[in-house]
C-alpha cells in the first residue's frame, strides 16, 4: 500500500516541454485543469499528497517520476538522459530528503537514468535501457538497489521512450502490456493483459491502493482492467500526451 504521493503543479513553460509526438503544443489552462483532476483522483486513494509549486525553469518538471526513484528502503536521485531535465533533481531533493532522511542515494555521471524507465514489482525493479537510461545508469541503479536488499534487471527497449510507456504493474501478478512488451520473455510469468495497438497510450496506468487511475477515452482497456476487480478512475491527460507524458509520470508513489 502507498502512503505518500509527491506531485508538482505544472509550470506555464510546460508548453515548451520535450516531445517526440506530433500532436501540437499543450494548452496551459487545459493542462492545469487536467492536473487538478489528477490530484483529485489521487485524493480518493487514501494517500497523503505533497504538492510542490511550479518551477518555470523546467518545462517538464510536472513529470516528477523521472528525477527520483522511491522504494520501500531508499530514494535514488536519478540523472536524466535529457540534459534539459537534469536540474529537476535539485529542485525535488529537499522534499525527498524529508521523507527518506539518511536514505537518499544518487546516480552519477556518466550514468543516466529516468525513473519512467523503472517498474517496481514487489522488491524487484525492471529497468528499461533506452534513449534516456543508459547501461551505466542501469548498472549503478542495480548496485544501489542490491545494497538496500532489493534487486533489479535490465530490459532493452526497441521502440518506446520509457519502459512504462507500454507497461503498468497492477499488483496481484497483473501486468498491462502494449506493443513490444507483450511478447518479451522477461514478463511471461505475469498475467499479461494485452492492450490493443489503437489504445496503447492507455498502457500507462497506476495502481494506487486497489484503485487504477488510467487515461480517459480508452474503453477496451478500461473494461479489461475493471474485469479484474479494480475500481477504475479515468482522468484526461490529453494535454500531457502532447509532451510525451502519461498518468504515471506526474506522481511519485511510496
Curated annotation (Swiss-Prot):
Substrate binds at residues 18, 60, 65-66, 85, 132, 243. Belongs to the DDAH family. This is N(G),N(G)-dimethylarginine dimethylaminohydrolase. It is an enzyme of class 3 (hydrolase). Zn(2+) binds at residues 162, 249. Hydrolyzes N(G),N(G)-dimethyl-L-arginine (ADMA) and N(G)-monomethyl-L-arginine (MMA). It comes from Pseudomonas aeruginosa (strain ATCC 15692 / DSM 22644 / CIP 104116 / JCM 14847 / LMG 12228 / 1C / PRS 101 / PAO1). Its EC number is 3.5.3.18. It holds the Pfam family DDAH_eukar. Inhibited by zinc ions. Competitively inhibited by lysine. The active site is at residues 162, 249. Keywords: Hydrolase, Metal-binding, Zinc. Optimum pH is 7-8.5. GO terms for molecular function: amino acid binding; dimethylargininase activity; metal ion binding. GO terms for biological process: arginine metabolic process; citrulline metabolic process; positive regulation of nitric oxide biosynthetic process. Homodimer. Changing residue 249 to S: Abolishes enzyme activity. It catalyses: N(omega),N(omega)-dimethyl-L-arginine + H2O = dimethylamine + L-citrulline; N(omega)-methyl-L-arginine + H2O = L-citrulline + methylamine. It comes from the Bacteria.
